[in-house]
């Protein structure tokens, strides 16, 4: 139940997040910086949990994710990563 709620929250977050071209985020805003950093950590953790060999998102510095397009690509890849994680755990005995 909790897993489904987390996945639903991430999907809702992705659907409601404004898609505004290549305009950069303001990294001087502590809330924006924390959100970008937490998203990167979540993607990195999910990739490690799924034993992904090539986790390119962990190599990006937070300044690179200031680009909205790059950050949104990372979040779009997060949903399949979480789906894979939950599916494999659900199938496990």
UniProtKB/Swiss-Prot annotation:
Tissues expressed in: Expressed by the venom duct.
Gene Ontology CC, one term: extracellular region
Post-translational modification: Contains 4 disulfide bonds.
Superkingdom per UniProt: Eukaryota
Residue ranges listed under propeptide: 23-33
Segment forming the signal sequence: 1-22
Cell location: Secreted
Record remark: domains: The cysteine framework is C-C.
Family of this protein: Belongs to the conotoxin F superfamily.
The name this protein goes by in its record: Conotoxin F_Vc1
Native source species: Conus victoriae (Queen Victoria cone)
Organism lineage string: Eukaryota, Metazoa, Spiralia, Lophotrochozoa, Mollusca
């Amino acid at each position: 139940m909790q897993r489904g709620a987390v996945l639903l929250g991430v999907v809702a977050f992705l659907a409601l997040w404004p898609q505004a071209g290549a305009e950069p985020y303001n990294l001087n805003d502590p809330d924006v910086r924390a959100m970008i950093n937490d998203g990167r950590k979540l993607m990195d953790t999910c990739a490690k949990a799924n034993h992904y060999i090539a986790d390119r998102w962990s190599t990006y510095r937070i300044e690179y994710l200031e680009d909205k397009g790059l950050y949104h690509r990372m979040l779009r890849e997060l949903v399949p990563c979480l789906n894979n994680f939950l599916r494999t755990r659900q199938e496990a005995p």
